[in-house]
């Protein structure tokens, strides 16, 4: 699986066991992701952070 880094022009290949891509937003500003990468389990959203997870190459 390949996931985009913070700047989507760059991406990385996920290590074994991390089979989801994610992007994280501040709830107050959903237009600009603050973090992207590989993850094993999609985190729950909080009052401050929103996570979007997916499982295809560079979907984040």
Swiss-Prot record:
It comes from the Eukaryota. Expressed by the venom gland. It is found in: Secreted; Target cell membrane. GO terms for biological process: killing of cells of another organism. Disulfide bonds join 3-21, 14-38, 42-53, 54-59. GO terms for cellular component: extracellular region; membrane; other organism cell membrane. Keywords: Cardiotoxin, Cytolysis, Disulfide bond, Membrane, Secreted, Target cell membrane, Target membrane, Toxin. Pfam families: Toxin_cobra-type. GO terms for molecular function: toxin activity. Shows cytolytic activity on many different cells by forming pore in lipid membranes. In vivo, increases heart rate or kills the animal by cardiac arrest. In addition, it binds to heparin with high affinity, interacts with Kv channel-interacting protein 1 (KCNIP1) in a calcium-independent manner, and binds to integrin alpha-V/beta-3 (ITGAV/ITGB3) with moderate affinity. Belongs to the three-finger toxin family. Short-chain subfamily. Type IA cytotoxin sub-subfamily. This is Cytotoxin 3. The lineage of its organism: Eukaryota, Metazoa, Chordata, Craniata, Vertebrata.
